[in-house]
């Protein structure tokens, strides 16, 4: 294959074996990211300032943005996009707490917090303005910017009126609680 070539202001992280991190080609982590022992990085990208704790899997083509915080034993499935935040200074990082499962092609950005052991099904997109609707009770409960612990979440939509008519808008639906395992 030949040497890996790049040009950047910041070098890439090195010495993965000594750090106790399993890194599969072509995974990349920028210097200034923290990756704990026991993390597995499939071909993926981890930006400066990101923090990833032990036992976490960053699967193929997943990206962990600058300053994002990923807890212990998290699974970031293939193609997941975790947003970063280097600026503006007052912006909050995305936080994925311990034991979460983030399904394939999910996007979590803008300082959203996913609490302990929550599960996001494939293709869930959550921003600060995304309605997260708990539909497990008689009356729905709405959240924004936070997914409660152990929630099981799938993509959904709701109808919204606009001047030009009614249209479906994406949301995230809490459809249950993660079972004990």
Regions found by a protein language model. Give the residues of each.
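Terminal amphipathic alpha-helical/low-complexity segments used for targeting or macromolecular assembly
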Residues: 1-21, 150, 155-181
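Structural signal for interior beta-strand "rungs" in well-ordered beta-sheet cores
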Residues: 21-161, 174
């Amino acid at each position: 294959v030949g040497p890996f070539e790049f040009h950047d202001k910041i070098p890439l992280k090195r010495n993965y074996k000594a750090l106790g991190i399993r890194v599969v080609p072509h995974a990349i982590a920028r210097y200034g990211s923290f990756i704990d022992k026991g993390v597995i990085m499939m071909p993926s990208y981890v930006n400066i300032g990101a923090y990833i704790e032990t036992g976490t899997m960053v699967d193929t083509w997943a990206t962990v943005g600058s300053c994002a915080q990923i807890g212990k034993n998290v699974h970031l499935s293939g193609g997941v996009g975790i947003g970063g935040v280097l600026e503006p200074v007052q912006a909050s990082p995305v936080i994925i707490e311990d034991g979460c499962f983030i399904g394939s092609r999910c996007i979590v950005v803008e300082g959203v917090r996913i609490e302990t052991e929550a599960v996001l099904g494939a293709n869930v997109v959550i921003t600060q303005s995304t309605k997260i609707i708990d539909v497990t009770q008689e009356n729905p409960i709405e959240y924004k910017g936070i997914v409660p612990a152990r929630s099981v979440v799938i993509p959904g939509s709701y109808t919204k009126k606009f001047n030009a008519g009614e249209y479906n808008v994406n949301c995230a639906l809490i459809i249950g609680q993660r079972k004990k395992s």
